[in-house]
Amino acid sequence: LMPFVPNANDLAQWLAADRGRSISLGTSAWQPNERIVGLFDIHKGEKRGDWKLSFETLTTTQRTIHLKGIHNVDGNRPLQNLTYSSAKGLATQAVAMAKVFSKRGTSIAVAQTIPDAWSIARKVAAELEPFVQVHEDIKLVQRFLAAEISEDFELIDMLSKGVVVHHAGLPAEALSLIEWLTEAGHIRVMCATTTIAQGLNFPVSSVFLATRKLPYGNEMSHRAFWNLAGRAGRIGHDSVGVIGIAAGAQPNEIRKYVSDATASLVSRLEGMLDDLQAAGELANLSWVMQQEQWADFRSYIAHLWNEKRNLDAVIGEAEQLLRNTYGFGSLRAKADKASQEKADALLEATKGYVRKLAEHPENASLADVTGFSPEGVRSTLLDMNNLENKLTLADWEPSSLFGDKSKSVLPSLMGIMLRVPQLQESLKEISKGQGNSHRKLADITQAWVTGSSIESIAKTYFEGDSLTDQISKACRAVYRDLANNGAWGLSALSKMPTSGLDFEAMTDEEKRRLNNLPAMLYHGVKTEEGVLMRMNSVPRSIAERAGEDFKARTEAGAENTLSPRKASEYLKSLKPDDWARLKPDNSSLSGEDYLKVWKRLSGEA
C-alpha cells in the first residue's frame, strides 16, 4: 500500500517471509488527486527590467492531458515590485507562481531554508492588498501570536493579507492554528520549507518548489516529492492540483527527476555496506561499526542482547536475528557473491560486537532504557561520576535544577549531554555563539521553564538580522531541539546509576516530581499542575495560572490527586469569565479568546 515503491514484494517478504504477498493496485486508475506536474522558468521581457514566467507540463492525468505543453503564466512581471534581476532567485520564482495560482485557492511556495521562506513571504505580502474585512478567525490567531510570541512578530501583519509561513521556526501550536486557517480557506499563499511534506492534510490548489534539495543539500526522495505533490488538488478539495519545480540552470535534471516517478525502498544498512565494499573497507567492519553512522545499528544489537542476556544464545541466533532487519534479509535473498560477502561480514562483525557487550552487560541494559548507544551510556556514566560534587536528590528537585543559577547542576548536566552522540548535534546548534556552550544551554532552559517569553529568550540568547530572525532561531531551538533532545537527555541522565537518585527509596510524590522534569522542559512550565495544563493544550502564557487554580480546586475536593483526566474535566468546566480571571494582565487575548484557542488546539471545537 506504499505508493511509488516498486519493490513491494521485497517488503512483503521481509515483513512476513512465510506468507508475505504484495497487492497490486495497478489495474485501477485510482490516484489521490487530479494533478499536473511540471517545471517553471523565468524569461527576460522586452522592456528593461521586465520578466515573465512559463510552465512546462511534464506529467498529466487522463483528465488533464489536454494541458500538455508550455504555457505562459500571468503576463508581465507577476510580482510587480521586482525587476528581472531581482526575480531570478528560484525561491522568488516559486512564490511568484504561488501568487498567480492563489486565485484558485491556497498555494504553497516551498523554499529550502527558514530565512528563504521568510524572504519570499515578505515579497509576496508586499504585492497583495490586505483583506477588505479581516476574518475573525484570522484576528484570533493574530492575537494569539501577539500573546504567545511577540506583539511585533512579522507574521501578524502578513496574516491580514492572507500570507503565512510554515516551518520549524514556529511553535507547534502556531503551526496548528495556521493549518486551521488554511483548511478554512482564509490563506492565499503559504511560504514553507520542505517539512511541509510530512503528513499534512490541508486543502491547497498548487505547490511550487524552488528546489528539490533539502536544507543540507540532500535530494528530496521521490516518495517525499510525491507525498508533497499529493497535497494539491486532493479528492474532495480541489479539482486539479498544479505542482511545479523551478527549472533553474539544469532543467533536464528536473525532467528526469519527475519521470523517475518511483524508487525502490533501499535499506540504509545495505547502503552503508555498499559504501564500505566500494572503499575496500568491508574487512574492517568491526572497527568501522564504532563510527557514529552505525550508532542506530549498535543500539539495535544492544536491544537484542538485552532481551536474551545470554552470549551463546545471541551468537547462535545472530543470523536469524539479523534476518529481521530489511537490509540483512535483502542481502541474503540475493544470489550474487558481493551480497553474500556483505552479509557474512555483517554477521561476523555483529558477533564480535555482542562479545564486547557481554563484557559490560549493564551498558546494554541502560542503552535499552535510555535510547543512547552503549558507548554513549559508558561515557555518560563516567562523566557523571567525574563531576566535582556528587549528585543528590536535592540537586534534581525542580526548584533547584531550574532555580538559582549559581547553585544549579543544570550546566553540568548540559555539558554531559553535549558529549552524548545521540544528543550533541541539535544541542550544539542551540549553543552556537559567544560564551560557554553548556552554560548558555542551561540559561535558555531555565528561562524557558520559569516562564520567560519567546521574545525575551530570542532577544537575550539569539543573534539575528531582525527580530523575526531571532524569534525563528529561538522557536526552532526551544520547540524542536531543546524540548525533544533536552527532555530526552534529562530523562536518560536521571536513570543512570551515577545520578545520585535511588528511586526505590523515594516516596511516590518524589518519584512523580522527578518523572515530571522532562515534561517541564518539554512544555516550558515549572510545576506539575502546569504540565497537566500544557498536556491538555492550554497556551503556555496562561498554563501556570490555570494550573494553580486547578490545584486549589482539586485540593479542596474529596479526592485531591492531580491527574490528566481531572485536568481535562476542569478545563471543560471553565467559562469565558474564568479564563478572563486567569489570563495575564498584559495579554492581547481575552478570556473568550483563550477559550476558543484552547478548544481549537485540544480538538474540543
What are these model-predicted stretches?
Residues 241, 249-312:
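C-terminal or mid-to-C-terminal helical accessory/interaction module adjacent to the motor/catalytic core
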Residues 19-23, 33-34, 105, 160-161, ...:
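Short glycine-/polar-rich loops that comprise or flank the Walker A/P-loop
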Residues 202, 206, 212-262:
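Conserved segment of the helicase C-terminal RecA-like domain
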Residues 1, 111-115, 175-212, 230:
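Beta-edge loop/turn motif
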Residues 289-307, 313, 338-605:
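C-terminal accessory/interaction regions of large nucleic acid-associated machines
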Residues 3-8, 30-34, 113-117, 170-171, ...:
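Conserved nucleotide-binding/hydrolysis micro-motifs of P-loop NTPases
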Residues 85-189, 216-226:
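Conserved C-terminal RecA-like helicase domain
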Residues 4-121, 164:
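Conserved interdomain linker/interface between the two RecA-like ATPase lobes of SF2 helicase motors
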